[in-house]
Structure formats: structure tokens, C-alpha cells
């Protein structure tokens, strides 16, 4: 019985690693679509969300399985990353996409409008971002990604929680800067 449990545990770990690898390979290099139904939150109003098509984008996506009100309260944590990234490549936009549950939508909208309207927050009340980008896994480790100006994923990972991701992001930004907004693999 003990050997069976060990074998099953090892099999589960191996399958999990294969899933993560497959999710990574499916997302890396794919093109991300910003659906027209996204709304920009400004104060107490919503406006159509429009991206600058000539800029690179750092997308930070919070789906309905995550605590969106918690995410809103932590937007200020991104300030130093945003400032440092823009000092490397000024043509980068940080896009925070919030897709809260129906029950949290009003609170999230209010919190963004009152406290965080200076951030580039897109509100997705219909789940259109997820539907338009089926290559993005549900695993939230894949919900922070750097896109070049063509909206191709060039880096996956959150630089807030990993110095190695931050170093890779700086290298990728230099690559994008040196190649007119496009990422060129070495």
C-alpha cells in the first residue's frame, strides 16, 4: 500500500509538471487580444478601453477566481516596477485587467474609481478577456505577461515576486527597445 501511494504521488507530480510546461509553451509567443468590451475605469465613469498599438504592454490579469478587491488594494505595489520599466523603455503600458465576480463588481469599480484611477485598469465584467484568449491558462502564475507592440507574449511571470523575472523583464525590454517595439529572439 505504501509503495502504491508513493507511485501515485510521483505520477501526480510528473503529470503536473507536464501540464505547466504545456501551458507555458501554448502561451509563450501567442498573441493576446484586448476585446472591445473592456472598459477603462476613470473616477466613477467607465470609458471604452483602448490600447496604444505602438506600445509594448505588461498585462496583469486578475480573473474571477482571484480576490480582485485585494488586487486593487495592491496596485501601488507596482509603482517602482512601472517607473523602472519606463526608464528602460518609455513606450510600455501597464494594463491591469480586473474580471471580478458579479457580487464584487460594484465594490471593485468603486475602489478603482476612488483610489486608483491613475492606473491603467481595464474592467472586464463579462469575462471577454478570458474568452478571447483561451491560450491563457487558469493558473494565475500565467496571468502576468510582457507583450511586444504586436501583442505577442515575450515573457511570463510576475516581477513583483521574483527578482529573476524582473531581470529577465529588463533584458526583454531592452530587446524590444532595440528592435522598434518588437521582440527578436537571440
Q: What is the predicted role of each segment?
A:
Residues 108-141:
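Short, internal strand/loop/helix patches
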Residues 17-52, 72-74:
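N-terminal "domain-start" segment that seeds a small globular fold
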Amino acid at each position: 500500500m505504501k509503495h502504491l501511494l508513493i507511485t501515485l504521488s510521483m505520477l501526480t507530480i510528473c503529470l503536473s509538471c507536464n501540464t505547466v510546461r504545456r501551458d507555458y509553451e501554448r502561451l509563450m509567443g501567442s498573441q493576446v487580444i484586448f476585446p472591445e468590451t473592456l472598459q477603462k475605469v476613470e473616477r466613477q465613469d467607465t470609458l471604452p478601453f483602448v490600447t496604444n498599438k505602438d506600445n509594448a504592454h505588461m498585462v496583469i490579469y486578475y480573473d474571477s477566481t482571484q480576490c480582485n478587491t485585494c488586487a486593487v488594494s495592491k496596485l501601488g505595489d507596482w509603482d517602482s516596477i512601472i517607473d523602472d520599466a519606463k526608464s528602460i523603455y518609455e513606450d510600455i503600458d501597464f494594463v491591469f485587467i480586473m474580471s471580478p465576480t458579479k457580487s464584487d463588481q460594484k465594490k471593485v469599480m468603486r475602489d478603482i474609481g476612488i483610489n486608483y484611477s491613475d492606473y491603467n485598469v481595464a474592467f472586464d465584467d463579462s469575462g471577454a478577456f478570458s474568452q478571447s484568449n483561451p491560450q491563457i491558462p487558469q493558473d494565475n502564475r500565467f496571468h502576468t505577461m510582457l507583450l511586444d507592440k504586436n501583442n505577442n507574449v515575450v515573457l511570463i511571470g510576475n516581477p513583483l515576486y521574483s527578482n529573476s523575472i524582473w531581470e529577465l523583464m529588463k533584458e526583454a525590454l531592452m530587446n524590444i527597445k532595440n528592435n522598434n517595439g518588437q521582440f527578436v529572439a537571440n
